[in-house]
Amino acid sequence: MDQKRLFLAIAISLGILLGFQGLYRHFVPEPPAAARTATNAGQGKPNNTLGAVPTDATASQSPPPKEGARLAVDAPRVKGSISLVGARFDDLVLRDYHETVDKNSPLVRLLAPLSGDEPYYVEYGWVPEESGIATPGRDTEWKADAATLTPNKPVTLSWDNGAGLTFMLKVAVDADYMFSVTQSVRNTTGKPVVLHPYARVRRDYRPEVEGYTVLHEGLIGVVDGILHEITYKSADSDGAKNNGLAFEHASTGGWAGITDKYWLTALIPDQITSVDFSFRDTKPNGRDGYQVGIISHNPDQVAAGAESASTTHLFAGAKVVSLLDHYQAEYHIPSFWEAVDFGWFWFITRPFFYALDWLYHLVGNFGVAILIFTVLVKAAFYPLASKSYRSMSKMRLLAPKIQSLRERYKDDPTRMQQEVMQLYKAEGANPASGCLPMLLQFPIFFSLYKVIFVTIEMRHAPFFGWIHDLSAVDPTNLFNLFGLLPFDPTHISPFLHLGIWPLIMGGTMYLQQKMNPPMPDPVQARMFQFMPIIFTFMLARFPVGLVIYWSWNNLLSIGQQWLIQRRTKLPRPELAKV
């Protein structure tokens, strides 16, 4: 009975750790858009201004704006251009990242123009409170006071509406991924003008996503101090019920944007300014499209002869953890670190990342950092492991007595269980202690999996030999004889992938299992014999960095168990016969 409970505990623990996030999102869905709208309206916010960022619903049926002059963007980590037709940020490439591990592969493109197949861009504008005021739109031709935007040279775009209003966008970029855009209006009309400045991120297509419950890709933001994550699918369903609106909320400060696994495009208003956030399903030209917008809650009152200005920051780049932390501190952005999906166990996952990142900067290789990290974890749990292995050794010595009790009381299971428990108590043995180290390994395993899977630092991080990307699966495959046969078995089935490192992991798990005392129940013993095979195939599709961790952890466990048993007075068990 104890062994059955133990086996059940292991299964439940693994299920909870690997499935918690998916179950939570399934059973605790986000409130429907209508309910959120009612809640926001109750905060004293006029309903006619909530979510008032334009969507160009009518313009979406017209052809893309004409191509025109462009303002070049040349910074250390990004390059591209800004269209002067519409002042659209629609051409941005990340200098530090390639699409594949091949250094000759194209650089990662983050933003793309309307004329392409996958438009992804950022726009700025104004909404007047009075009709009849001409404001810049998607076809507006702006003038730039320079040809190239660099970190040392901001550029101002301007447009005169011909009726006494001059609209200006002063654009600056730093050495990393942060733009600042100051929207200003000069009023020479002779009367006051009331305007709401806005900004929006638009993705006029639905991208392919990883599809994992442990990773969010889609619309994201920290609004009123709360993280909001809406998938593309949820945006479609919520938007269909509420005229395209999936989420809206008024907040002082915050941030919002669209996130991919490694990349983020986010709007960051002044953190002391009251703004309205909205997430929308836009359906441009009848296909899926998405918009994240922010608009000033309180309008700019531009007096006659005066000028107004408001500044918004735009993050467009890779979700480098240290950079997010830096920007969070510099601009007082609330919880900007949550752009990286560290998950519900972030209180474990984040410290693990920082430890691995520190070790990486110490040794220069994330694979080696994982090995050192594993040694440190093993050392921290050594006292517990020592106690566990001593109890396991006692269990091995008690095996003949337990077998004798089973034979004596085979017709009375209740009495047999009582006698076995009395024997455990008398000898000071704990049948569950042998699996305690494995149970403790699961949260470490899950947290390390999150770190390797979601952080940009692990992307294309090499190890040794054939491992060029710790975040990807082992590229070798037993089923094509490790590349000797010219075909890809995964085209037949995704399960036909078994690399060298998963095989090493399975072998070390088998050796570790043989050092444990045999289970008294032959049925459960046979079940556990298949565990190395099951885990080998399971981990074959996991990031190879995680498989390396598990393999190294198994080897350390074998050595640790051998050392502990050698130091005790109990006889050191031999490997069980196969």
Curated annotation (Swiss-Prot):
Q: Which residues cross the membrane?
A: 7-27, 362-382, 436-456, 491-511, 530-550
Q: Which InterPro entries match?
A: Membr_insert_YidC, Membr_insert_YidC_N, YidC/ALB3/OXA1/COX18, YidC/Oxa/ALB_C, YidC_ALB_C, YidC_periplasmic_sf
Membrane topology designation: Multi-pass membrane protein
Q: Which domain of life is it from?
A: Bacteria
CDD domains this protein is in? 5TM_YidC_Alb3, EcYidC-like_peri
Pfam families per UniProt: 60KD_IMP (PF02096), YidC_periplas (PF14849)
Any Gene Ontology biological process: protein transport
Compartments, as annotated in UniProt: Cell inner membrane
Q: What GO molecular function annotation could you give as one example from this UniProt entry?
A: membrane insertase activity
Question: Annotated region Disordered: where?
Answer: 35-70
Instruction: Return the GO cellular component terms, semicolon-separated.
Output: plasma membrane
Q: Give the Gene3D superfamilies listed for this entry.
A: 2.70.98.90
Q: Which UniProt keywords apply?
A: Cell inner membrane, Cell membrane, Chaperone, Membrane, Protein transport, Transmembrane, Transmembrane helix, Transport
Indicate the quaternary assembly.
Interacts with the Sec translocase complex via SecD. Specifically interacts with transmembrane segments of nascent integral membrane proteins during membrane integration.
Assigned protein family: Belongs to the OXA1/ALB3/YidC family. Type 1 subfamily.
Q: What does this protein do?
A: Required for the insertion and/or proper folding and/or complex formation of integral membrane proteins into the membrane. Involved in integration of membrane proteins that insert both dependently and independently of the Sec translocase complex, as well as at least some lipoproteins. Aids folding of multispanning membrane proteins.
**What is the protein named?**
Membrane protein insertase YidC
The organism is Granulibacter bethesdensis (strain ATCC BAA-1260 / CGDNIH1)
Q: Which gene encodes it?
A: yidC
